[in-house]
Regions:
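Switch/coupling sub-region of P-loop NTPases
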Residues: 2-129
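Conserved P-loop NTPase
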Residues: 122-213
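C-terminal non-catalytic accessory extensions
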Residues: 225-227
Length: 227
């Protein structure tokens, strides 16, 4: 969420209040939190997650963050993503051990049409890494996967997933894949197509990616030193 430019309004839809909304407000982010009813409850004073998402669409250009996608709100979410109703980032959390696991959950469990799933651009897979004795664990991002748009029914069989970053457990770090290094990213190229100096220039795009990585690394190192 910190990657969103503060001038853009952020709408957070959650049934359990977990995201650091107040901290972001203290950093001058324009952020609205909408508390919705749990998917486990059929009635109550709070609106459903489905209605919460549809209400957020009426607020105009915003970034939409869903705390966790659990039920029928998935259909409303993908409807918004397909039509570009929010004109900015749409992100959410869903349980899945891999990119295909997310696809399986969204399409087969939550009944979102497979063609609608193509509105997904990027899937970040996070899971705990355990110590050999099983007593310790660390949360890590294991892969960053791009969802291509050319497949029809099954993105796994039809090569609709492309890993851009993969976790190296020995080095304890994310590493770029050959696809990313060689410029085989439709998402990044699509973003770059609207940026002067980046369109059609993969070297400029990748240099900027590396620069941003160095900036983030410096921020983390300073934070660790200063506590």
């Amino acid at each position: 969420m910190l990657e969103i430019i503060p001038k853009y309004r952020i709408i957070v839809v959650e049934d359990t209040l977990e995201l650091p909304v107040e901290s972001l407000r203290n950093l001058q982010y324009n952020i609205i939190r909408m508390k919705v009813r749990s998917a486990l409850l059929k009635s109550g004073t709070e609106v459903s997650a489905d209605d919460g998402i549809r209400t957020s669409l009426r607020l105009g250009d915003s970034s939409l963050i869903i705390g966790e996608i659990r039920s029928t709100e998935a259909e409303a979410l993908y409807e918004a993503m397909r039509v570009g109703a929010l004109a900015n980032v749409v992100a959410g959390t869903i349980h899945g051990a891999s990119a295909y696991g997310v696809f399986d959950r969204v399409v087969n469990d939550l009944k979102v049409p497979a063609t609608s799933f193509k509105a997904t651009d990027i899937i970040a897979v996070c899971n705990p890494i355990k110590s050999p004795d099983g007593l310790h664990s660390w949360k890590r991002m294991l892969q960053l996967t791009e969802v291509r748009k050319h497949w029809r029914e099954d993105p796994l069989i039809e090569k609709g997933f492309t890993d851009l970053l993969k976790y190296n457990v020995k080095k304890d770090e994310l590493e770029p894949t050959d696809d990313l290094i060689n410029g085989d990213s439709e998402t990044l190229k699509d973003i770059a197509s609207n940026v002067k100096g980046w369109a059609g220039n993969w070297d400029a795009i990748y240099d900027n990616v590396l620069l941003r990585a160095k900036i983030k690394k410096e921020i983390v190192e300073v934070a660790e030193k200063t506590g």
